[in-house]
Amino acid sequence: MSPQTETKASVGFKAGVKDYKLNYYTPDYVTKDTDILAAFRVTPQPGVPPEEAGAAVAAESSTGTWTTVWTDGLTSLDRYKGRCYHIEPVAGEDNQYICYVAYPLDLFEEGSVTNMFTSIVGNVFGFKALRALRLEDLRIPTSYVKTFQGPPHGIQVERDKLNKYGRPLLGCTIKPKLGLSAKNYGRAVYECLRGGLDFTKDDENVNSQPFMRWRDRFLFCAEALFKAQAETGEIKGHYLNATAGTCEEMMKRAVFARELGVPIVMHDYLTGGFTANTTLAHYCRDNGLLLHIHRAMHAVIDRQKNHGIHFRVLAKALRMSGGDHIHAGTVVGKLEGEREITLGFVDLLRDDFIEKDRSRGIYFTQDWVSLPGVLPVASGGIHVWHMPALTEIFGDDSVLQFGGGTLGHPWGNAPGAVANRVALEACVQARNEGRDLAREGNEIIRAACKWSPELAAACEVWKEIKFEFEAMDTL
C-alpha cells in the first residue's frame, strides 16, 4: 500500500468498536410525525447499563453493526439510524426497562409488513447483550399507513354484504377439527347454519389432508351454505381455509372459492406469512371476498411476558396486511386474555383513532386515518352462559364463535345453534332495554330458557364449566 493510500484511509475513519450509546442513545431527540415508534421491554444482561441496551436495540434494528465500518462514511447515519430516545423502568420488575426507539420512515418499504418486521424484530432478539426483549407496541405514522390497502372490506362493508346489523355475528368451528370426510363435514356446516348461526369455520389446521381434500370440502360446504340460505332467508358463510404450502396453491383455492360464489375465505396469517396474507387480501378486495384470519402460532410469539412480540403489535400488523376478522381471545373462555389489555387491542383493530392509554397497554396514540376496521373474533371454550359477558365486553362489532359450545349440545348441531342464537338475541334485547348484562346476565339467560327448550338443555349441560386460571398477559 502506498503512503498516499494510507493517508486517505486514515482520514475520517477510525476502526474499532464503540459503545452503542455514543451514537444511538439520544435522549434529546424530538420524534417526528413520520417516525415509526417502538416500545421495547428490555432486560439487559448483568453489567449492561439500560442506556447501552436500549441503544443496542436501536442500532441493531436499523443501521448499526458490532464495529465501525468504513462505508459508514458513504451515507448519512444521522438521517437513517434508529434512536433510543427515552428509557423508563418497568414498575414492579427488577432490571426491566421500556426503551422507546424512533425509526426514520425511509428505512421501510412502502406497503410491506414483511419488511417492517424484518427490520424491527428480524435480528436484534438474539443479541447477546440482552437477556430478554419484547416488542410491546408500535406507532405507525399516517404517512406509512396510507401505503397499505389494509382489510379487504372492513366492518361496515361486511355488514352491508351480509345485511346484518345491531348485534354480534355468530360462528362455529366445525369439530372434530380433523378426521371427518368432506360430506360429513358439509352436513355439520348445514345443520349449524340452518339452526341460526351466521358463519361456520374450518379449523386452522384444516387444509388439504388425505381424509378430506380441499376441493371436496369447498364443494360440500358451498352446497351446505346455499341450502341453509334458501331455508332461512339469511345470508350465510363458511370460512374456507385457503392456507396452503405455496402462495400459488393458496391463490388457486381462493379463486375456486370465488367461482363457487361463497362470501368468505380464511387464512392462517402467521404460519402462512405476511407476504402471502397481503397477496390474498388484495385478491379478496378485488373479487368481493371477505377474509377471516386465524392467529395460529401467535402464543409462541406473544405468550411470554418479557420476550417476544405482544399481540397488540401482531394485531396492528394484521390490520395493515389485511383481514376482515381476526381471533382476539375471549377474556372469559379457555384461551389467554386479560380484559383491559384485550379490549385495548380490540379497539386498535376496530377504531379509527385510539388514544395512548397505558392502563390498557397502549403505549402510543394511533391514527389509522381511512384504513378499514377488523372484526375481533371471540373463540375458545365459550358457551351459552358466557353470552351476556361476551355481548357486554365485545359489543356489536364482533364475531362470537362457539365450537364445542354448539356441536356439544346434547340434541345435536342444529339445536346447539338455536341455543346460541336465542341466547344472543335475548342478551341484545335486554341490553337495548337498558338492563345490566354484567349483573343480570344469568337471570336473562334463565328467562330465555323458558321459551327455548334448546337453550334450556344447553344451560343444563354447561352450567358447571369454567376456565378459572390467572391470565399471564398483564401489565
Curated annotation (Swiss-Prot):
<keyword id="KW-0601">Photorespiration</keyword>
<comment type="function">
    <text>RuBisCO catalyzes two reactions: the carboxylation of D-ribulose 1,5-bisphosphate, the primary event in carbon dioxide fixation, as well as the oxidative fragmentation of the pentose substrate in the photorespiration process. Both reactions occur simultaneously and in competition at the same active site.</text>
</comment>
<feature type="binding site">
    <location>
        <position position="327"/>
    </location>
    <ligand>
        <name>substrate</name>
    </ligand>
</feature>
<dbReference type="InterPro" id="IPR033966">
    <property type="entry name" value="RuBisCO"/>
</dbReference>
<keyword id="KW-0120">Carbon dioxide fixation</keyword>
<keyword id="KW-0503">Monooxygenase</keyword>
<keyword id="KW-0488">Methylation</keyword>
<keyword id="KW-0460">Magnesium</keyword>
<dbReference type="InterPro" id="IPR000685">
    <property type="entry name" value="RuBisCO_lsu_C"/>
</dbReference>
<comment type="similarity">
    <text>Belongs to the RuBisCO large chain family. Type I subfamily.</text>
</comment>
<dbReference type="GO" id="GO:0016984">
    <property type="term" value="F:ribulose-bisphosphate carboxylase activity"/>
</dbReference>
<keyword id="KW-0007">Acetylation</keyword>
<feature type="modified residue" description="N6,N6,N6-trimethyllysine">
    <location>
        <position position="14"/>
    </location>
</feature>
<feature type="active site" description="Proton acceptor">
    <location>
        <position position="294"/>
    </location>
</feature>
<keyword id="KW-1015">Disulfide bond</keyword>
<feature type="binding site" description="via carbamate group">
    <location>
        <position position="201"/>
    </location>
    <ligand>
        <name>Mg(2+)</name>
    </ligand>
</feature>
<feature type="binding site">
    <location>
        <position position="295"/>
    </location>
    <ligand>
        <name>substrate</name>
    </ligand>
</feature>
<keyword id="KW-0934">Plastid</keyword>
<protein>
    <recommendedName>
        <fullName>Ribulose bisphosphate carboxylase large chain</fullName>
        <ecNumber>4.1.1.39</ecNumber>
    </recommendedName>
</protein>
<feature type="binding site">
    <location>
        <position position="177"/>
    </location>
    <ligand>
        <name>substrate</name>
    </ligand>
</feature>
<feature type="active site" description="Proton acceptor">
    <location>
        <position position="175"/>
    </location>
</feature>
<dbReference type="GO" id="GO:0000287">
    <property type="term" value="F:magnesium ion binding"/>
</dbReference>
<dbReference type="InterPro" id="IPR017443">
    <property type="entry name" value="RuBisCO_lsu_fd_N"/>
</dbReference>
<dbReference type="InterPro" id="IPR036422">
    <property type="entry name" value="RuBisCO_lsu_N_sf"/>
</dbReference>
<comment type="subunit">
    <text>Heterohexadecamer of 8 large chains and 8 small chains; disulfide-linked. The disulfide link is formed within the large subunit homodimers.</text>
</comment>
<dbReference type="GO" id="GO:0004497">
    <property type="term" value="F:monooxygenase activity"/>
</dbReference>
<feature type="binding site" description="in homodimeric partner">
    <location>
        <position position="123"/>
    </location>
    <ligand>
        <name>substrate</name>
    </ligand>
</feature>
<keyword id="KW-0150">Chloroplast</keyword>
<feature type="binding site">
    <location>
        <position position="379"/>
    </location>
    <ligand>
        <name>substrate</name>
    </ligand>
</feature>
<dbReference type="GO" id="GO:0009853">
    <property type="term" value="P:photorespiration"/>
</dbReference>
<keyword id="KW-0113">Calvin cycle</keyword>
<keyword id="KW-0479">Metal-binding</keyword>
<dbReference type="InterPro" id="IPR020888">
    <property type="entry name" value="RuBisCO_lsuI"/>
</dbReference>
<feature type="binding site">
    <location>
        <position position="173"/>
    </location>
    <ligand>
        <name>substrate</name>
    </ligand>
</feature>
<keyword id="KW-0560">Oxidoreductase</keyword>
<feature type="binding site">
    <location>
        <position position="203"/>
    </location>
    <ligand>
        <name>Mg(2+)</name>
    </ligand>
</feature>
<dbReference type="GO" id="GO:0019253">
    <property type="term" value="P:reductive pentose-phosphate cycle"/>
</dbReference>
<feature type="propeptide">
    <location>
        <begin position="1"/>
        <end position="2"/>
    </location>
</feature>
<feature type="modified residue" description="N6-carboxylysine">
    <location>
        <position position="201"/>
    </location>
</feature>
<feature type="site" description="Transition state stabilizer">
    <location>
        <position position="334"/>
    </location>
</feature>
<dbReference type="InterPro" id="IPR036376">
    <property type="entry name" value="RuBisCO_lsu_C_sf"/>
</dbReference>
<dbReference type="Pfam" id="PF02788">
    <property type="entry name" value="RuBisCO_large_N"/>
</dbReference>
